[in-house]
């Protein structure tokens, strides 16, 4: 049997789960301003339960009306409206055979005053928070009365969770939030009974857990999410976290092992530059030291990896959250042996980026995530009646458009001038740490085959070719043309473009290389070239990678710095000569010369407006997706396919 353990039932306390797959908590931010759920949020969790997940732990849920909120629309479980609201989520999850725990949360020093009626954040000690890319918050030190009050509120929140129909609660004691701030010497500088020794630092959490256990029913599950490592100097390392787990074991039914705090944010929610399963030793060590079940999050991207980790004793249950953002049916598809149809998380951080921007939780490769009440299949306008639609371009945007149009009843035909599908994503997949993009292309190709979508490779979409098809509509998803700067020397033999590098048409060793353009692609090309070369990234803006989400940017820039890549900002390319580049300082206009044996242009793409106009002149209905629409990211490509092909 391929999945001997992954789809085997398992128990936490006296509660049996149908399999070992857990959707661990993540900020979905689909609630309302009263801390209550919304139809979109209910649908979000219901779809994952319907997809086969065994246990769902919704996003962090506030225990206090007056403090600890980390977002103005964070869910709460402290009043009667919220209890009734959570009943809807619990009923939806139970309806499809999954179980649900509510994660109890207080932000402590991470709770902005703006989200808490202007009130100052409170924490074990007056220690500034430290966040990658975010301003600091100075909390006040909690009094004993504050501690006593919050213990009561955690206990009441657990009681409310049981009233709402949940199967258990998880106290959030990780990620630099309040309870973890008590646990870690990095943030706990107290000298009373709540600080100093490990036992004292655990006292707040022990009081919460014992209070909850005394207040809820016997079979109601009580667990804790803990760190396996804080990954900050002065914090708890793996050995310390293991001792904490051993000390807390008598008070919990399970542990959910994660890692990191806001000062080490790239370890909490890892971008693609961290390999799958990189943190597995954290959970494995803690599991070996305790006798209660352990859930572990390990940036799982493949069900096969989840099975292997269960076999290796890394954990008893597997957290697969971002995996289920990308594809809510990952469990069903794996059980059916259709792994080829699973859209797997890229680690692109679009989900976190959307939440930080104040939007619903969205996924770059699944535009329905966070938009299911609008773009769910039950809302499809099936007016195609078999009419033909020409889709120009076989990248992710084009394939997404074709898939949607097929579901709407049209007959899409993809025209791709190259001998393969994938478009510019093929280039992206060649950069270091971007293998998941290649897997996405293969998955989308499998979808084209599964839905019997006609694909014409090596077929440029000229006006004449398209006219021969007599299409009802033309969808243009052909991407853009690379930007070539109008400068002296741009046509010299030592000037190359990103496809020359990433497709390995050329290779360099021992060269002084200037990469012109410090956007995402430019930085990744620099990463690609940094072995055995001296690489300099040249960017005209004040910073590089400004469109990259902050934790991914931090991680990528760290990798480049470790590899000796130089970053030169506020300089624009002015010319290329033999063995050098001429750069213009953007502040003074002065031109300086820098040595460069090789020059790589990584300035991005722009839509081909002349081709677009030809199509508009020739056909009545023409819509644009992806780069042909406005340029941008994978998320732009797939979402624009829905936005522009949902109805016409």
Which sequence ranges carry the predicted segments?
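Flavin-dependent oxidoreductase catalytic cores
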Residues: 1-392, 396, 400-407, 411-412, ...
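Conserved acidic residues
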Residues: 54, 167, 253, 316, ...
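Surface-exposed acidic, glycine/proline-enriched linker/cap segments
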Residues: 196-197, 371-385, 438-439, 500-512, ...
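Short, structured coil segments at secondary-structure junctions
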Residues: 251, 290, 313-314, 451, ...
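Rossmann-like dinucleotide/flavin-binding elements
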Residues: 383-415, 456-470, 477-494, 499-548, ...
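Rossmann-like dinucleotide-binding cores of NAD(P)H-dependent redox enzymes
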Residues: 411-451, 527-571, 629
